[in-house]
Amino acid sequence: MPRSLKKGPFVDGHLMKKVDTAVANSDRRVLKTWSRRSTILPEMVGLTFAVHNGKKFVPVFVTENMVGHKLGEFSPTRTYHGHAADKKAKAGRK
């Protein structure tokens, strides 16, 4: 269920301060954040965020297509190593 329109999008205050200073100074440095829950706003387009995935910071360059999504959507937290091979099937092929 989406967030109510009268409430508006959620962005952490500390992250918005970083974005405002970066835009005002036209600073293109990577902005490090743990705020995966923050919504991407149009002011953030063109900035690069280092979003924490629980282990490390994943660089995310914000484009126009990402507006309205959450920062955490672009920093996966789980790694997929594939399913284990079936040992019985391998033994039968010999």
Swiss-Prot record:
SUPFAM superfamilies in the record: Ribosomal protein S19 (SSF54570)
Sequence ranges of Basic and acidic residues compositional bias: 83-94
Superkingdom: Bacteria
Cellular component annotations (GO), alphabetically ordered: cytoplasm; small ribosomal subunit
Single GO molecular function: rRNA binding
Keyword entries, A-Z: Ribonucleoprotein, Ribosomal protein, RNA-binding, rRNA-binding
Gene name as annotated: rpsS
Tagged with keyword RNA-binding: yes
Protein name: Small ribosomal subunit protein uS19
